[in-house]
């Protein structure tokens, strides 16, 4: 798109590019038509600038439209528009779990609600784990379980390697 915009700008408003490409545009305009080279210089600001700005805006507008169309097509292809932008991992984890039971003819309607609630649950779990006062019930249990399961193999390993030091730590 840049080359086409560049060519359009040179054709419709050669004055702005005279500064950048003074030699090239100067020679080409004189060889092609002297009127084109002389008229923009006489009225540089009023005539060439409006087409340049309109061209730029049209180009940007077209690009934005194309981007929006692509963005609109993506959520239609992926039935979960909520998950891809912010939380790709939960989508990958939740998608198979939800798609297996949701074998109804309308999975796209069933999955967004479940995934949004699951994402909210994931976010709330993360927040609670980060804060840990509301979840005081579960972290101690999990920590105790992990410590116990962690200590049992360590005891065996410690008795094998150097029992005196490690038994002091375990006691």
Curated annotation (Swiss-Prot):
Q: Where is the composition biased (Basic and acidic residues)?
A: 152-171
Which GO MF term does the entry hold, naming one? DNA binding
What is its biological role? Gap class segmentation protein that controls development of head structures.
Q: Where is the composition biased (Low complexity)?
A: 32-42, 52-80
What is this protein's record name? Protein hunchback
Tell me which species this is from: Scaptomyza albovittata (Fruit fly)
> Which segments carry the region annotation Disordered?
14-93, 124-171
UniProt GO BP = segmentation
List, as start-end ranges, the regions of compositional bias called Basic residues: 17-31
Q: Where in the cell is it found?
A: Nucleus
Q: Which family does it belong to?
A: Belongs to the hunchback C2H2-type zinc-finger protein family.
Keywords annotated in UniProt: Developmental protein, DNA-binding, Gap protein, Metal-binding, Nucleus, Repeat, Zinc, Zinc-finger
Its cellular-component GO annotations read:
nucleus
Q: Which intervals of the chain form a coiled coil?
A: none
Lineage of origin: Eukaryota, Metazoa, Ecdysozoa, Arthropoda, Hexapoda
